[in-house]
Amino acid sequence: MQARPPRVPVTRDLMLLIHSHLNLADPDSAMLWAAFSTAWFGFLRVSEFTTPPSGFDPSIYLPISDLMVDCHLHTLGVLLLIKASKTDPFHQGVKLFLPCTCGMLCPVASLSAYLHHRGNSAGPPFLFTDGTALSCLHVTGRLRSLLADAGVQGNFSSHGVWIGAATSVNGAAFPTHSSELSVISPATPI
């Protein structure tokens, strides 16, 4: 049996490259960028922000109503309620704060721009203009095609976004606990 090639992390530099290869005036591209930047800054696994083939269940998966963007003049960030994840087997949920970074990779700016196109109708947060929900296969396929179009070779997968975010924090010499600073326990009042 052949060993699977190692998954390549989607680093900050690759995120910038992805950003430069998307036409953000296109609503579907704006949606992909919002999903990628949300996942990267939130250290999200693909199952925490996409819809599975079995369909969307708002009691388990992230609905648009659990994504709160502070749209005031001085936006502080976005609050997500992740209801279930691999690291939350009892589905207690966790509140996750994504800060405004005021840079090209800012998850708040990308979500605000995308939500302008999407509107606030019920359902999963990340929808293509034809109403199809973003899935793991979409994330992996688009990630691979965007990076291939940019001339980047590698075994990229949706998990590479999570790995890349963690690698970037580690490589930036943040204290070990910094990658956990954006997580707010379920009991924390907001």
Regions found by a protein language model. Name each.
Residues 1-190:
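Extended, non-catalytic subsegments within catalytic or DNA/protein-binding/adaptor domains
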